[in-house]
Amino acid sequence: MKIYLPLPAIILIFYLIYIIFLIVMKKIRFNAENLEELDGEFIFTFIKKIKKEQIYFHIDEVKMCVLTRIFIREGTFRTINFNIFLNDGYNFRLRKKNECLLFLQVCREKRKELYQKILSMIPADMTVISIIERELDNFKR
C-alpha cells in the first residue's frame, strides 16, 4: 500500500525540518563562541556557517567597540553585547556576559582611552556606568 502526501504537506515537513536545523545551529554557534585573553592578546573562536574559525588580535588593533545591547535587572547585567571593529577590517560580536566583561576589563587596564570611549557611548546615566564598574571589580578571569 502506497501513501501519497500532497505537495503542501511535503513542503511543510521540509520547512519544519529546516527551522529545527536553524535553531540547533544557532545554539551550537552560541555555545562554540569563546574569547581567550593573555596579556592583551585575544583569540576569538566562533563557528561561521559550518567551519570553525579563529581571529587573533591585540587590544591595540581595536578601532572601535560599540555596545549594542544591555539588559540590567536588580543591579546586575542579564545581557550585554558588543560589536568590535578591528583595524584590518574584521568585525565580530561578543554575546556572552563573561566575554564582554573580560574585554572591558582588559580595555580598562591596557587602553584607558578606548574604555572611556566605550563608557561615553552608553546612552544612560551614571547608574549604568557604576553597575559596569561594580561588575568589572567583581569579575575574575
Region spans (language model):
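Terminal and domain-flanking low-complexity segments
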Residues: 89-141
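Short linear motifs in intrinsically disordered
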Residues: 32-37, 67-75
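Extended low-polarity, hydrophobic cluster-rich segments
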Residues: 64-68, 80-82, 102-104
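Phosphoinositide-dependent membrane-docking surfaces
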Residues: 54-72
